[in-house]
Amino acid sequence: MTAIRGGSRRAPGLALALLGGVLLGACHGDENAQVNALPGFVSGSVRKTAYDGASDDLLTAGLGKTGLGSDTRPGFANPAQPSAAELRRLAIYSNYRALVDITPNGGYGRFWGPNVDLAGNDTLGEGKIAGTEYLAYSDDGSGRKNVTLLVQVPASFDPANPCIVTATASGSRGVYGAIAAAGEWGLKRGCAVAYNDKGGGNGAHEIGTGVVTLIDGTLATASSAGSSSLFTASESSSTLAAFNSAFPNRYAYKHAHSQQNPEQDWGRVTLQAVEFAYWALNEQFGPVVDGTRHGIRYRPGDITTIAASVSNGGGSALAAAEQDTRGWITAVVVGEPQINVRMTPGVTVEQGGAPVPSFGRPLADYATLANLLQPCAAAAVAATGAPYLSALPMGVTQSIRTQRCATLAAAGLVSGADTASQASDALAQLYAAGYLADSDLLQAPMWDSQAMPAIAVTYANAYTRSRVTDNLCNFSFATTNPVTGAVAAPAVSPMTNLFGAGNGVPPTNGINLVFNGASGGVDHRLATPDASFAGAFCLRQLWTANQLGIGTNVDAVRVAANLQHKPAIIVHGRSDALVPVNHASRAYVAQNSATEGRASQLSFYEVTNGQHFDAFLSVPGFDTRFVPVHYYDEQALNLMWNHLKSGAPLPPSQVIRTVPRGGVPGAAPALSTANLPPIVQSPGANAIAVNAGVIDVPL
């Protein structure tokens, strides 16, 4: 590993991690300089590491297609103290598998995977990709932002035909979070890939021990790490000690507890990732001047750059394109973007010629509502047969559903004299709030899997700029007894492999979401018979009553849907029950048409039977009913590449009517092209009409 020295800030705890590496000198400077200089936002040293494409590589960390597809995750030589390289390997393994269906029947190794080339053919063997990585922090000088930036430059990069693809992390994942969603396509195309972790990055602080994560996933104490930790809780050591005494075995998380409202910066840090990639490419391919330093070969706008990713990363790409004032971004391709749109009067979302009940709500609104109602709505007749996605016994889950319905009814929040009617009313309220009937069978698994509770709690903390010591709405993050769910000390600290195995939003990697009741902290699902209704209702009230500054902080993350006439593609699954299409993509496209008018170059592809988590597609009931949206994300990237490089027109906005695999849950037939119709130039009756602030999606 080589490291390029930037700013002066460097933690003592990093010294051992840098052994075996070299520090290369570079100064910060302005864009008009003739010498390549690190952007001013880069803090500390840049680590440069070369990978041979055999023992280790950019895409698979040396695991290859076979290793990524194996259910046996890579281990550590010393489980108590894994190396940075081992943590990187586990992070790539975990994040790759978290974004796509990894089963052969589901498409891995046939439609996507390291062995599959950009034409969809199995020609690349194990798919290892040689090249170089550049790793650094972006910071504002406070040492508290510490956004992780990473650039991968494949050995196949052609300096005469340069390209960059952004791969901003989805969810609250670490810097490798979008390696399967966008990084893989970019590397295969021979492009540099610009990653960032959005200032969430799976950074955690173990309150009882003071242990924190560093940029490479290795650990240090908060005091020794100083300002070089991924995240350290802002409270004083005495305050944290008192909190730990009252609430032991708790964890602070960066996205939830940094008090930064990091989402407001997601567009900016994505642009920084691109600028950092420009610097890396100039460093690698620029002419040598004065014998040691490199000159400027590429200036803003010289490199074909596609802002890409999915979910939160997709929203970040859209925000970056809107904020781009220097020509960093050429085009945008995103999947299922989590985006909060600033809607203007007159903008309308229709389906089948009729206005939808609700659209354009921010995540803080729809997530807190869904978290409140989903456990009850899951008992509705329309949700019968939903895939079961919980480790709890079915009897426990059914009891939770019944009790949540009863408590909602007692509070006057749903109507009905029995569970069935109460559940139907809860589901009807979700319809009225903009959820589609296409999502009926996903309401249960979105809550049972704890995806929605995790989102509601983490984002409520972020949008209120809460501290870990606030225990917002009596929720916190803790290790628990696997049988009772009560807070308990872990047998082995989850911090050891957190960088490699965690996803940044508890419950993850043994750190669970707990509700702090009279008897102490317990897994929120088990803390009360109605699964911590009081906490869920409190989260909802934060939004409805505009408490703790939530409205102001949500306004700070809204976007205008002005892509500045850049060519763009949005892909979204119609059945998405985590990021409902009415509130995200449909609303964005409608607002974009009002903002940009006929100058807009945005195409929108809505995928029937597509939902948010392709990694769930191997679960019984998911396999038979839903199709991979990732397949269309890759098709969209190919379409955009052809548009940029050969002038091929982008297909117009359309509904893609897929065919579920069917069969027996857990044993669906192999995915085939019969399930996946192409995106077409002439969609006919499947065309989505977009004009002057109105989008009309065919039924």
Curated annotation (Swiss-Prot):
Among the GO biological process terms of this entry, one is: butyrate metabolic process
Sorted alphabetically, the keyword list is: Hydrolase, Secreted, Signal
Q: Which reaction does it catalyse?
A: (3R)-hydroxybutanoate dimer + H2O = 2 (R)-3-hydroxybutanoate + H(+)
Q: In which pathway does it act?
A: Lipid metabolism; butanoate metabolism
**A GO cellular-component term linked to this record:** extracellular space
Does Transmembrane appear among the keywords? no
Which residues constitute the signal peptide according to the record? 1-33
GO molecular function terms here? hydroxybutyrate-dimer hydrolase activity
ATP-binding is among the record's keywords: no
What S-S linkages are listed for this chain? none
As recorded in UniProt, its EC number(s) are 3.1.1.22
Active site per UniProt: S311
Q: Where in the cell is it found?
A: Secreted
What highest taxon heads this organism's lineage? Bacteria
Q: Which Pfam families match?
A: 3HBOH
Similarity annotation: Belongs to the D-(-)-3-hydroxybutyrate oligomer hydrolase family.
General function of this protein: Participates in the degradation of poly-3-hydroxybutyrate (PHB). It works downstream of poly(3-hydroxybutyrate) depolymerase, hydrolyzing D(-)-3-hydroxybutyrate oligomers of various length (3HB-oligomers) into 3HB-monomers.
Q: Which named protein is this?
A: D-(-)-3-hydroxybutyrate oligomer hydrolase
Species, as recorded: Burkholderia mallei (strain ATCC 23344)
- Name the lineage: Bacteria, Pseudomonadati, Pseudomonadota, Betaproteobacteria, Burkholderiales
